A protein has these predicted regions:
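HhH-family (HhH-GPD) DNA N-glycosylase catalytic core used in base-excision repair
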Residues: 1-271
Length: 273
């Protein structure tokens, strides 16, 4: 897998993983990059991506059990949670920065998820001038109203994120998107090939393509780049990040010094602000 000390083995009810310092589901769920990692009363979580869902429960020694076949874990959930990347190596490269050392201590279990591009486009359009509970509620309503039922876990029904075709021409008012509704409707008019081609573009071209779309500015484009295309050099800047750069670095911070994982640095910084 990676240079980190990782335990990954089959157990009777799924796959046990243990990554001691760089994988914490609560930190990931609270990080603001995903809105469908659902906490359960037993301390577990349900993750959903595309047409797959999995229950994840606490395992031994701080690990987690993925309740799914090993092949599904390998093909779906390892990529989704970016488990093959060496986040410990990323952290070691930040060790010379006192602020980032503190950020690692506070939120070193975060990983940058490899999420569905289309879902991220809609989600981060919804996120504009919004807070996490409202974003989560709007996304849940879209899934429950227009998505495909995927199954029930612990008495709760889970749904896929609706495809462009499932949203096209629909009344989205139940999700209370406000002015963002027209942007989402416009996105749904693009055919699947548009999003496929976007994934093939280099970073600069993809960012320009996204910013050219109505309803997507620079910050949303960079969020989509990071969370929907896994372009790890993307460094989304909002008012909080800009304030941190001013306060901690006196306005002088160049994300390119962390080439290949600048987006991870951004996520850690947000946790510590």
């Amino acid at each position: 897998m990676s240079g980190e000390k990782v335990i990954c083995r089959r157990v009777s009810d799924g796959v046990l993983i243990n990554i001691p310092h760089t994988f914490d589901l609560k930190q990931i769920a609270d990080s603001g990059q995903c809105f469908r990692l659902t906490a359960l009363q037993d301390g577990g979580y349900v993750a959903v991506t595309d047409m797959k869902l999995v229950k994840i429960t606490p395992g031994t020694n701080g690990g987690y059990v993925f309740h799914c076949p090993y092949d599904e874990f390998r093909d779906v959930w390892m990529p989704y949670f970016d488990l093959s990347a060496d986040y410990e190596a990323y952290q070691q490269k930040m060790a010379g920065d006192p602020f980032l050392r503190e950020a690692i201590a506070a939120g070193g279990g975060i990983r940058v998820l490899r999420q569905n591009l289309w879902e991220m486009v809609v989600t981060f359009i919804i996120s504009q001038r919004n807070n996490i509970p409202r974003i989560r509620k709007a996304v849940d309503i879209l899934c429950q109203t227009f998505g495909t039922p995927l199954g029930e876990i612990d008495g709760q029904q889970f749904y896929s994120f609706p495809t462009p075709a499932q949203l096209r021409g629909q009344d989205l008012s139940p999700a209370s998107l406000g002015y963002r509704e027209s942007y989402v409707k416009e996105m749904a008019e693009y055919d699947e090939d548009f999003w496929v081609q976007l994934q093939k573009q280099d970073d600069d071209t993809a960012r320009k393509t996204l910013i050219a779309l109505r309803g997507i500015g620079e910050k949303v484009a960079n969020c989509v780049m990071l969370f929907g295309l896994h372009r790890m050099d993307s460094y989304p800047r909002d008012v909080w990040i800009n304030r941190m750069i001013d306060d901690v670095y006196h306005g002088n911070f160049d994300p390119s010094q962390y080439a290949g994982f600048a987006g991870y640095v951004q996520q850690l910084s947000l946790i510590h602000i």
